Amino acid sequence: MKAIDLIDGPVSVLNRDDVDTDQIIPKQFLKRVERTGFGEFLFFDWAKQPGWDLPSNPILVAGRNFGCGSSREHAPWALEDYGFHAIIAPSFADIFRSNCTKIGLLPVQLSPQACAAIAEAGVIALS
């Protein structure tokens, strides 16, 4: 696991609750055994929708219960491979949170109000 000293920069906002691991990385992309190459498939089904835009910033601000569903490790791998170093949300699925910390992807649980304020500000520094 990599050490985490400071993560700062612009945030990407995914204003959705109950985002499950199947939405983060669909099952058809789980055949790889290495941890790299998943970023291009992140939120694959949503990325095909008109108007979808999720910049590759260091920090993702998400909704409640982020990472629910199956316990696949591929979801944190895809988020990390896409460029995220931290995820800020009001709550996380327990197994997802554990999988994130194992690879050095920082899950930060804050109040819904704090998440909304960070999303509106568009930038944050975490240390």
Where are these regions (language model features)?
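N-terminal beta-alpha supersecondary unit
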Residues: 1-56
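Solvent-exposed alpha-helices and their adjacent loops that cap or buttress functional pockets
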Residues: 3-6, 52-54, 80-81, 116-118, ...
